Structure formats: C-alpha cells, structure tokens
C-alpha cells in the first residue's frame, strides 16, 4: 500500500491546518455511535496528553449518568504535531509506504478503471500502477482527474486564520474566523467574518489569495494582542489553507441531513451531528463510490452527500468512519460496484464497528 501525502506531515486540516478538535463520537445524549478506527484515532490523538478538552465522563468512567444531554460530549482537543507523528508511526508499523511531498496530477483510465495515477514530487513525474484507489484528498482530486461525476461547494468557504500562541495567558489556540463550534456554544456570538468573501478552494490563484488574507489576519490579531500583552508570540500558524468543503463525488447514493435515524442495509458505520445533540446517521456504502470508475472509492469529506449533509460529514470522526470502510473495501475487491456488502460489513464488525442504530438498542430519539 502506498500513501501519497501532499504535505510533510500526516493529518491534513486536522494537523497542518491546526483545526485540532476531534469532534464527537457520540450523539450528545449518552450514546457512542462511531467506533472502530474513529475511536482508535481519538485515543491515539491524546495518548501523550490532551489539550484543553478531555471528556473524563467518556474516557475515565462508564457511568451513563455522566453522559446526559447536559454533559460533555465524547470529543477532545489534541496537539497537532504529536498526533501527526504518532499516526505516522502507526502507518509505518502497518507496512504502509508513505510518499511525502507527492501528489496526483493525472489518472489513466481504461475501461472504467484507474490503471495508474500520475504523480509529481521532488523526483519529478512518475506513474504508479493501481489495483484500487482510495481518494482521501479532501477535494475529490482523483475522482475529478479520473472523470468520475463530482459536485463543487455552492456556498464556498469563509476565511479562517487559526494559530497557536504563547503569552501571559499561556499556550493557546486562537480560532480566528470560521470555527467548528456547536450551536449550543455559539449562541450569542456576534463576531463578524474576517473577510466578506467566500472561497471555492479549487483554483491556485484564489487559494493563494486566501492564504495571504489568512496570514494578514493572523498578524493583525497578534499586533492587537501585543497592545496589552507584549509577550504574545505566535508558536504555529497553519501551513495549508483552512478550507472545509470544496468538491465531492456524485455517488450511487447521496445522503441528506434529513435522513437521521434511517436504516440503510449497506451501512458501513454511524456518525453523529457535531453541531447539535440527538441525530444519528448510518453511512451507506453506496455514498463512497460511483460505478463510472469501478476501482475508485472515496474517504473523508468528499463522499456523496447533499450540501446540507456536507457540513456534518466533513469532520474527523466521519472521515475515520468512511476511511475505515473505504480501506477495508479496497482490500477485499477491485470493483466497488460489485462489492460483497455482507463480507465488508462482517470484516468491519470484526474490527469493532457497529453498523446500525438499532444495534445500539436505544430506539428513535
């Protein structure tokens, strides 16, 4: 297995992008819904210590009385660099070949299959022959290059400029601009956007402008903070654009926000709504692929969902759920349109994944 990583650390927006909140594995009313790799990665992210948020009611206790709708959800804050290195070590142990600074620029498609992916790196341009391809680019780049049907974000992305700092208040994460804050914590916030403009995120010139605006916003905030605290210094800024939604595949099924608590026979796991308490969604396997490119499967924030559902599915737990399903499927078949769904589901269950809400024995909420 070969992993192409455009950056020089693993983790994408969750590490290089400094969006270091591992959003909830639970539904917010006492029930864990995401398991398997989603939980493994959460625990790995804080295995050398959590930052700011630590859900003791989930990690240090099994008492359901401490997991009500009034209690802390199963989410954490982690150190991005520790998480990236720990993840790298896990991949190395698993025998994965990691190619840093390497990204796809084209795909050779023959008879509805990706025969090879053309990549560029410090080594120049190379061809990697493929049996199966998992597109976890976040921008559906492989799908786009291979000619699979895709959709782009209609609402665009608000400017963000998250950065870490050290000052008289200590070490902290400053969440400037777009923020992954649940509705219950967002009440009363009146801060204006950093810029009255949205970004699609799929053009080099536009993304470069976005990064410059982000850098300027960071510098302006530092100057403002230094008026009252001369010791205030930045300790880390994002080294990639803090884009949330850009492009996604049009799969065999498109999941919508209104399909909470709905049973799907081909479910490969469950996710919650990080923004509010209550909803549970089963994730259909048919949202991960298009039959037009039979050996391509999606993982992360570019699966087949409506615009309304996209904001739910773009976060780390959902990326882990779809990533585990996609990777497992890629090990079992070379044609995702002909996937033996029972074999896939059993393999996922053997790895600790719970597939259906009814298996939680909680009924409808």
Segments (PLM) and residue ranges:
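Short gly/ser-rich anion-binding loops that grip negatively charged ligand groups
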Residues: 27, 31, 73-80
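A structural motif corresponding to the C-terminal end of an alpha-helix
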Residues: 90-97
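N-terminal capping segment at the start of a domain
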Residues: 45, 49-50, 58-70
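N-terminal FAD cofactor-binding segment of flavoenzymes
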Residues: 4-56
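Short beta-strand element of Class I
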Residues: 1
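Flavin (FAD/FMN)-binding glycine-rich loop and adjacent Rossmann-like elements that form
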Residues: 14, 37, 41, 56-59, ...
């Amino acid at each position: 297995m070969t992993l192409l990583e455009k950056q020089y650390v693993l983790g994408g927006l969750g590490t290089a992008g400094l969006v270091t909140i591992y959003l909830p594995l639970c539904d917010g009313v006492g029930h864990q819904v995401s398991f398997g790799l989603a939980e493994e990665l959460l625990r790995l992210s804080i295995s050398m210590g959590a930052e700011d948020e630590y859900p003791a009611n989930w990690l240090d206790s099994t008492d359901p009385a401490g997991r009500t709708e009034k209690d802390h959800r199963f989410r954490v804050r982690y150190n991005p660099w520790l998480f990236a290195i720990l993840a790298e070590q896990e991949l190395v142990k698993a025998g994965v070949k990691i190619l840093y600074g390497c990204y796809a620029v084209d795909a050779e498609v023959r008879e509805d299959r990706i025969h090879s992916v053309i990549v560029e790196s410090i080594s120049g341009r190379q061809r990697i022959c493929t049996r199966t391809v998992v597109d976890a680019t976040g921008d559906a780049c492989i799908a786009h290059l291979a000619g699979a049907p895709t959709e782009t974000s209609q609402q665009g992305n608000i400017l963000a400029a998250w950065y870490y700092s050290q000052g008289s208040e200590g070490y902290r994460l400053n969440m400037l601009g777009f923020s992954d804050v649940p509705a219950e914590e967002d009440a009363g916030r009146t801060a204006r956007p950093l810029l009255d403009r949205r970004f699609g995120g799929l053009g080099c010139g536009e993304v470069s402008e976005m990064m410059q605006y982000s850098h300027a916003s960071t510098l302006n905030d530092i100057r403002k903070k230094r008026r009252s605290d001369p010791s205030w210094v930045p300790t880390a800024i994002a080294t990639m654009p803090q884009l949330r939604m850009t492009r996604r595949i049009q799969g065999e099924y498109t999941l919508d926000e209104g399909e909470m608590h709905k049973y799907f026979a081909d479910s490969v796991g469950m996710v919650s709504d990080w923004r509010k308490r209550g909803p549970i969604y089963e994730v259909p396997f048919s949202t991960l692929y298009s039959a037009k490119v039979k050996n391509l499967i999606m993982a992360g924030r570019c699966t087949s969902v409506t615009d309304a559902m996209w904001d739910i599915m773009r976060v780390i737990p959902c990326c882990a759920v779809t990533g585990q399903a996609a990777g497992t499927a890629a090990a079992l078949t070379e044609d995702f349109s002909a996937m033996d769904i029972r074999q896939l589901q059993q393999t996922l269950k053997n790895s600790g994944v719970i597939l259906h809400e009814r298996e939680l024995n909680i009924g409808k909420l």
